[in-house]
Amino acid sequence: MAECCVPVCPRPMCIPPPYADLGKAARDIFNKGFGFGLVKLDVKTKSCSGVEFSTSGSSNTDTGKVSGTLETKYKWCEYGLTFTEKWNTDNTLGTEIAIEDQICQGLKLTFDTTFSPNTGKKSGKIKSAYKRECINLGCDVDFDFAGPAIHGSAVFGYEGWLAGYQMTFDSAKSKLTRSNFAVGYRTGDFQLHTNVNNGTEFGGSIYQKVCEDFDTSVNLAWTSGTNCTRFGIAAKYQLDPTASISAKVNNSSLIGVGYTQTLRPGVKLTLSALVDGKSFNAGGHKLGLALELEA
């Protein structure tokens, strides 16, 4: 009897994230949904011609300092081009031009410049990123009068395992000023990340999606030569499609809580508070308020 051969489909390969995004899922649980000591307003709009406008303003309740940014972005999809103009209240102007998937598939080139009229300071940076199955590479050149600095990174992935390296070479000093290494593992609902920065800082994080509405994260960090170990636990619970609550606590007894509510499509309100558990009656606690508008 002839055997029936059934074709086996190869396991789909995925593109690993850039080095800066390793462990991002765990960091987002700790960072998003909180804004201690700030009153913040974010507005995003898009014109009929496709130009995107983003405006952000914040006031620090401790110092009273007010800061803001304005960004316009236009995408020329036919040629893979993106033009971005930036301005902030420090009176710094920025221009960014990016081209993606045109020279070759997976390659992105970015030209980034900034100029401060008050001081006359100028800066320029050329960024390159290349991503394919199992690999994500990046190389940036930061131009400076003393000499350019070269930032490089590489992340390799295979069957959920991730390994990455990040470095910075200062040509003015002719030496490596940054050398970081990371190893991790991720699945659909679980991520593990460990890293060593410059051989002195050791860190790790775990992210787990316990169920559809409940995410948890654990973070641990230690610096060699000190007895200081930093440890934190955070969680986010989606109450319903329009509301979520976040909470976190660390080994310094700092307790943070946040509540996010979508008031209507395009309008989101976030309230947050930070409580010092060691001096609960002494004050020094912080509140935060953020409003996001998008149209």
Swiss-Prot record:
A biological-process GO annotation: lipid transport
Keyword Mitochondrion: yes
Gene3D superfamilies: Porin
Binding site for ATP: 24, 32
Predominant location: mitochondrion
Regions crossing the membrane: 38-45, 51-60, 66-76, 81-88, 92-100, 107-116, 122-131, 135-144, 148-157, 161-170, 177-187, 190-197, 201-210, 214-222, 229-238, 243-250, 254-263, 267-275, 285-295
Localization in the cell: Mitochondrion outer membrane; Membrane
Record-linked InterPro entries: Porin_dom_sf (IPR023614), Porin_Euk (IPR001925), Porin_Euk/Tom40 (IPR027246)
Keywords for this protein: Acetylation, ATP-binding, Ion transport, Isopeptide bond, Lipid transport, Lipid-binding, Membrane, Mitochondrion, Mitochondrion outer membrane, NAD, Nucleotide-binding, Phosphoprotein, Porin, Transmembrane, Transmembrane beta strand, Transport, Ubl conjugation
Disulfide bonds: none
A molecular-function term among this protein's GO annotations: ATP binding
Record's protein name: Non-selective voltage-gated ion channel VDAC2
The species this protein was found in: Mus musculus (Mouse)
